[in-house]
A protein has these predicted regions:
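Second-shell loop/turn segments in exported
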Residues: 1, 19-20, 92, 148-157
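A short amphipathic alpha-helical interaction element
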Residues: 1-41
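Divalent metal-coordination and catalytic microenvironments
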Residues: 10, 105, 144, 163
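Basic/polar, cationic surfaces and motifs that engage anionic cell-wall
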Residues: 25, 33-35, 40-61, 67, ...
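N-terminal catalytic cores of peptidoglycan-degrading enzymes
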Residues: 31, 35-136
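Conserved, mostly hydrophobic/aromatic
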Residues: 80, 144, 184
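Short coil-to-beta-strand
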Residues: 135-143
Length: 210
C-alpha cells in the first residue's frame, strides 16, 4: 500500500483552503486550518443523548370506534385501569364485538393514545361497581387504561405523563376535582386489582404538578 508524502497531503489541504499549494506547513496554513476546519461549526455544541424519556405537551391521539359502547353519559369520574395484555392485543380486543369490553382511552408506551369511545358515550369498562353511593360507574365515568399488569410492570414516564394530562383535561372539561380520579380496584374492591397503588399515586402526583 502506498502512502502520500507529507508535502503532498499539505498541498491538498492548502488547495482546499484556497492557499498557494506549496507543500509548506507554515503559520498561514495552520491558521487557515484552525479557522476553517476546527472552528467551522459556529453553532451550539451538540448535547449528549439522555436515557430519560422526554415528556411532551401533547401526545398523539387517534380514534378507532369500538363496537362495545352505548350512551350517553355525564362524566364526573375517571377510572384508571390496566389490561393485563399487550398494547396491540388489548387494542384488538377492544375492537372485537365479542369481547364486550371497551375503554375510552388506551395509552401506549410512548404516551400516545387510542380513543375508542367518545367522552360523552358509555364505554364498558367498570362492570359491577360503586363509589360513595353511586353504582354502575360505566354511566358516570371515563375509562383510561394502561396496557399490561401495572402490579408487574411500571408504566413509563411518558405513560404516566400522558394519563395525568388526559385526566387534567377531563377534570377541566367536565368540572370535577382530583378526588374523582379513581382506580378500578377502588370501585370494585375484592373483584379487581387495577391499577397498582404505585401507578395511581404517580398519576395523582403528576396531575398536581400540572
Amino acid at each position: 500500500m502506498k502512502f502520500k508524502g507529507k508535502s503532498n497531503i499539505i498541498k491538498e489541504v492548502q488547495s482546499k483552503l484556497g492557499l498557494k499549494a506549496d507543500g509548506i506547513d507554515g503559520p498561514a496554513t495552520w491558521k487557515m486550518i484552525w479557522e476553517n476546519l476546527i472552528h467551522e461549526d459556529k453553532g451550539e455544541p451538540e448535547k449528549p443523548e439522555t436515557p430519560v424519556q422526554k415528556l411532551k405537551d401533547d401526545y398523539p391521539e387517534v380514534y378507532k370506534a369500538s363496537p362495545n359502547q352505548s350512551g350517553p353519559i355525564k362524566p364526573k369520574y375517571v377510572i384508571l385501569h390496566h389490561s393485563s395484555g399487550s398494547h396491540d392485543g388489548t387494542r384488538s380486543w377492544i375492537l372485537n364485538a365479542a369481547s364486550k369490553v371497551s375503554y375510552h382511552y388506551l395509552i401506549a408506551a410512548d404516551g400516545s393514545l387510542t380513543q375508542f369511545v367518545y367522552d360523552k358515550k358509555r364505554a364498558w369498562h367498570a362492570g359491577r361497581s360503586s363509589w360513595k353511593g353511586v353504582s354502575g360507574l360505566n354511566g358516570h365515568s371515563i375509562g383510561i387504561s394502561f396496557y399490561g399488569d401495572t402490579n408487574k410492570r411500571t408504566p413509563s414516564a411518558a405513560e404516566i405523563d400522558s394519563a395525568a394530562k388526559k385526566c387534567k383535561y377531563l377534570m377541566d372539561k367536565f368540572n370535577f376535582g382530583i378526588d374523582n380520579i379513581l382506580t378500578h380496584e377502588m370501585i370494585a374492591p375484592n373483584r379487581k386489582n387495577d391499577t397498582s397503588n404505585e401507578t395511581y399515586q404517580m398519576v395523582i402526583n403528576r396531575i398536581k404538578e400540572l
